């Protein structure tokens, strides 16, 4: 905790932080669909089968709605006054309306011609309403439903929102739930609450959720405190963490440590020489995780691209190197110089990462962490039993698993091991509601499950093991309870004879 207090905290927000700037990470929202991108000039973005440029969003406030116009340009949408109830002409019954496909006078060719002329989606919807022979006969609710359906199809309204834990968790759960182990957003909120994540804490996290849990913890801690991330494989995966767009001050308290070195740290056999035997591409994995351009260029993004070489994440450098290799005049000292610079940069990154690993090992060796969060695709029992030794007494721990059975086994092992109290296995239940005038009801479709949580608190058990008098006193009490007192002899009265 002392080390975390010395590091500089994040700078206070300025009024300009509420406006979109070039290079910021934002989330595009259309209806209930989200996509995280990085704002760059003249960068083509494909979203919901439409492409556009994000140049015009720079300088606007977060939450502004834009309309896609011809040429892929985004223009701020002007607010339009909704028609009042008096001006609406609606029927009272839909039973006489027959869906024969002839109620709409406009054909698909007519609608396509309107799009080619550059007519906005709002005007197309208005023309569809005017050319519908059954629209005025529908009830008011049916008219609203019809308008909403046509707007969703023909109006391209994009809202640019600021990334947050709630938005990113909803985005991942809806688009790629397998990458976050099918963790629902309400389950993530329960994890943050049960784990007592707050500023100034010293937390340990082991997760394989693309960095979503790590980013949620960093957001709640606000750049104060320290987080030690344990990772399997060549390097930590932080694709979702990069979407938050944290400032550099937040990264000063973030450490990583390889999971395969935890046992040596527990047994006291860890040394700096053991880090030299790690794969040398771990620094490259980190760099590729922080770059979002290649991963989100298409809808079908693949998480395996995080192990690519760093040149693939920099198109300009890649084009330069391709030109040099194709032109024979440029071969020679320039090519050797670029390779030398690349090797030196690679060695510098590896040395920095080695120092961060040693700092993380020193923090773990203190064994005074304020909490533990585990949310991985691996079996939770061996992970939790090993990592609990690094947590201070009277501190919370939370384990997430998509299935209940592994957590039941973990629950049993913890009861046998001891050193924990208030063990609780829980599952959150979520149902979405539609809230509209005279039409509020639970939605027909709901999530089947968002995973299970095992939570509890650590307690000190060293004193009980070391003090043998407690055991002897306990055995003495047990012997006294089991022994029965000897039967008393009756005194016979003396008779006079």
Swiss-Prot record:
Tissue-level expression: Expressed in brain, liver, testis and ovary.
Compositionally biased tracts (Basic and acidic residues): 79-100, 327-354, 478-497
Binding site for substrate: 94-104, 145-154, 175-182, 349, 377, 415-423, 434-441
Any one GO biological process: mRNA processing
Pfam family name, one: Gcd10p
Keywords: Nucleus, Phosphoprotein, tRNA processing
Oligomer status and interactors: Heterotetramer; composed of two copies of TRMT6 and two copies of TRMT61A.
Entry function: Substrate-binding subunit of tRNA (adenine-N(1)-)-methyltransferase, which catalyzes the formation of N(1)-methyladenine at position 58 (m1A58) in initiator methionyl-tRNA. Together with the TRMT61A catalytic subunit, part of a mRNA N(1)-methyltransferase complex that mediates methylation of adenosine residues at the N(1) position of a small subset of mRNAs: N(1) methylation takes place in tRNA T-loop-like structures of mRNAs and is only present at low stoichiometries.
Protein name: tRNA (adenine(58)-N(1))-methyltransferase non-catalytic subunit TRM6
Lineage of source species: Eukaryota, Metazoa, Chordata, Craniata, Vertebrata
